[in-house]
Amino acid sequence: MARDLEAVIAAADQALRTWKPVWTPFLDGALLEQAQERLAGLAELEIASRGGYPGAERQRLLLQRHDAAIAADEVAIGLMGLELGGNFLFDPAERQDFRSGLLALGAGEGELGDLWLRGDRGAQAILTAAQAAALDGRTAMVRTVEVALEARPLHELQLPAPRLPRRFQTVEASLRLDAVASAGFGLSRNRMAELIRQGRVRLNWQPVSSPSRQLTVGDRVQLEGRGELQLETVTATKRERWRIELVRC
């Protein structure tokens, strides 16, 4: 991550030196927050972010000199959609399986934006226009399934519905990560524990592999494709359980 952050800082320096807008590669949520915090102190730098649709998890930062900044939506970002079509009825795949298939074809991590599943028919993704063009018409192997790749304009994609913040309460026997996250993300506790052990869950953007990890107020739990949970309040009940107020976004 340190190398990726240095690349963002170098892009900011380029924008300031050349007085021209610069788009970074796609950044994940952790790096996006870290980069924004690191660059926030530069008063002469204007920062915006875009990922191809509202609520995108992976986004690119637009870096501009404040004195010469123009509206972010007026700066060409060069994004394209990609259809990943195949029959996954008998061999269901996860998002990471599709991402790994694209990386195996030589796609750059920073060229790949969000990717979402389309049932047993495959997936769709947002990429840089250049990367989508390079993959258009090729095939990839995702698990045991051959997948056809087709570049598409963004408006032809079936984009995920915008995720609006939702506040709710749950009562749990413990503050274990698997218990709270399963309630918050609407998955079974066994499935959540499996995802945690697989490294698919992050706690405050840091990798975590122990389902029994204890949570505290202020903790944030991230799960790719399902957003983030924030622990707002925790109070003990008379029956020695925990009433937890969560915000999912």
Language model regions located:
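Short, basic/aromatic beta-hairpin or loop at an interaction surface
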Residues: N190-V201
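Ferredoxin-like alpha/beta domains used as RNA- or RNAP-binding modules
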Residues: M1-D178, G184, P207, V221, ...
